[in-house]
Amino acid sequence: MTNIRKSHPLMKIVNHSLIDLPAPSNISAWWNFGSLLGLCLGIQIVTGLFLAMHYTSDTLTAFSSVTHICRDVNYGWIIRYLHANGASMFFICLFLHVGRGIYYGSYTYSETWNIGILLLFAVMATAFMGYVLPWGQMSFWGATVITNLLSAIPYIGTDLVQWIWGGFSVDKATLTRFFAFHFILPFIIAALVMVHLLFLHETGSNNPTGIISDADKIPFHPYYTIKDALGFLFLITLLLTLVLFSPDLLGDPDNYTPANPLNTPPHIKPEWYFLFAYAILRSIPNKLGGVLALVLSIAILAVMPLLHTSKQRSMMFRPISQCLFWILVADLLTLTWIGGQPVEHPFIIIGQLASFLYFFLILILMPTCSLIENKLLKW
């Protein structure tokens, strides 16, 4: 008799995706972040659902409903902080996942890579709208500043902003629609994840060497299910440590003040995971130029498969490219730091130099360096 997991129409899909999936025998811990992102998405959807049961998307009661969740709802405080810090964990895993894709040349699977970029945009949009919902000072002013950037679009800009706001300023209509979008987007993300995995399973996983590994595969279960379970344990430990010991470590104190349109906070800044893009936005003195740079800071990932000039796929055996990759990482950390600083000397010039270096590295230096390494192979 055939095993049910190999014959049942639904179980067969699960079997081919998680159990009998042929996987490269040498993929390292850097390949754990895909499953960790799945775990993060699951945590966010479950905690978000429970929060939505008690939250009210009205400007008069939103702030107090979040307070009510923390004070009066059974275990409301832990659900709220798991959701808030879960977002930080989500982005840590996202950045490491994308970084691994760049380092090991996984972007050459262009369909999987492009769906991944769409996912990144969707997660960023969801996180931004989620930050607006508690209706604190930083929520309100963050929403005002970021949505206002769309007014830089020629001709339709002003109408577009008012259409998104649902009026002439960020108000009740804005909060209600942000709540609606924040609720629906994670399910769209989950659907995109399925497409992401569909394309990945068409080609199979890459591995650290970047060499085709068809001759050396092992079943996903039990080898990588155990490995992923260990990753889950690490992630949950880190998340619970953050939630139980310092839940507000990554938040902004200004968001504990109810939104006041008449009083601007001294430094308007987004959550830490957007600071690198915010620094790029601020480094360009022109509004439209800044908005374009902001979008391109993520969209530039789409040109990476086109700029791959190396004869080798992975950076594992390319020391010069490795050096440039780690300069890029350091540059992104610098941009993150600058994004949280006030707009004054010397932060302005540091931000401009770091923004220039970011685009220069990806568009010019890394492809040129790959060509030089191709020449060195012949020596």
From Swiss-Prot:
Residues that hold heme b b566 according to the record: 97, 196
Residues spanning the membrane: 33-53, 77-98, 113-133, 178-198, 226-246, 288-308, 320-340, 347-367
The UniProt record lists the keyword rRNA-binding: no
GO annotation, cellular component aspect: mitochondrial inner membrane; respiratory chain complex III
Membrane topology: Multi-pass membrane protein
Subunit structure, interactors included: The cytochrome bc1 complex contains 11 subunits: 3 respiratory subunits (MT-CYB, CYC1 and UQCRFS1), 2 core proteins (UQCRC1 and UQCRC2) and 6 low-molecular weight proteins (UQCRH/QCR6, UQCRB/QCR7, UQCRQ/QCR8, UQCR10/QCR9, UQCR11/QCR10 and a cleavage product of UQCRFS1). This cytochrome bc1 complex then forms a dimer.
Note: Heme 1 (or BL or b562) is low-potential and absorbs at about 562 nm, and heme 2 (or BH or b566) is high-potential and absorbs at about 566 nm.
Function of the molecule: Component of the ubiquinol-cytochrome c reductase complex (complex III or cytochrome b-c1 complex) that is part of the mitochondrial respiratory chain. The b-c1 complex mediates electron transfer from ubiquinol to cytochrome c. Contributes to the generation of a proton gradient across the mitochondrial membrane that is then used for ATP synthesis.
Name the UniProt record assigns to this protein: Cytochrome b
Record organism: Ochotona dauurica annectens
This protein's encoding gene: MT-CYB
